[in-house]
Amino acid sequence: MNQDAAGNTIPGVAESWETTDNKTFIFHLRKNAKWSNGDPVTAEDFVYSFKRAVDPATASPYSWYLEMTTMENAADIIAGKKDKETLGVKALDANTLEIKLESAVPYFVKMMGHTTVKPVHRATVEKWGDQWTKPDHFVGNGAYVLDKWVVNERMELKRNPNYWDNEHTVINKVTYLPIENQVAEMNRFLSGEIQITNELPLEHFKRLQKEHPESVQVQGNLCTYYYGFNNQKAPFNDVRIRKALSYAIDRNIITDAILGQGQKPAYFLTPEITAGFHPEMPAYGR
């Protein structure tokens, strides 16, 4: 699945799907979906990839995500209690994928837009092992494929002519530059060396917004910043203390006076810009 600019779920490799109980989902894959080497993208590719993601031998840092979906047996497989072959995923045919959950999850289709559930090319992974992501080996099924990768210097992507929606791809090449220093990144942007940056030094933000209003745009970021504390120990094991602390924090001072880059006060863990999320503001936030 993919997401549009507003965060709404839209078809990706799966052109349609259905469920009657929010526990068993059937996804119908596009017959014209291909890997960058020309191989067809099949339901079996997803079966292999999901099993690989939960396999303890893979040690995926995002295996928890499949557990969060409640995919059948995912939790036990990750914990080493069951074999990966028991995962609730099955290829009904080359273009039909069945996924079974342990609990009804109405938003499951939305969860299928996460990077963790994107398929990997089995033949490439099995041939090259931990070297499968090298530019000379990599095979993907997205709009771009990895062309060059110099660690800590640059990553270059080129257009994938075999992508199922290639006719709507408008950029032929994308280069990512890993720049740790925000001031250096800002200067390279101002000099025209890079076209897009999503970070600006806090102390320069207001000046740049005034001097380059056409370039500096503030858009919502789907994340939440929060203070964490141990609620298993006193005094934070008392819900009244936790509420008092929340009431005492002036979120507007933090967002407007300290950060001042368009952040909004948060009264929910889920960002307000999340598609379909329409919360009622708590009394202390009004």
Segment roles from a protein language model:
Residues 1, 5, 22, 30, ...:
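Sec-exported extracytoplasmic/periplasmic mature domains
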Residues 1-21, 51, 137-140:
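N-terminal lobe/hinge region of extracytoplasmic solute-binding protein
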Residues 15-65, 98, 188, 235:
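Aromatic- and charge-enriched surface segment that lines or borders ligand/interaction sites
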Residues 147-158, 175-233, 252, 256-257:
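Extracellular/periplasmic solute-recognition and catalytic clefts
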Residues 9-13, 39, 61-62, 108-118, ...:
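A structural "hinge/loop" feature
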Residues 18-36, 102, 110-112, 220-233, ...:
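Periplasmic solute-binding protein
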Residues 264-286:
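Structural transition elements
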Residues 72-75, 80, 86, 94-95, ...:
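Gly/Pro-rich hinge or "lid" segments in bacterial periplasmic/extracellular proteins
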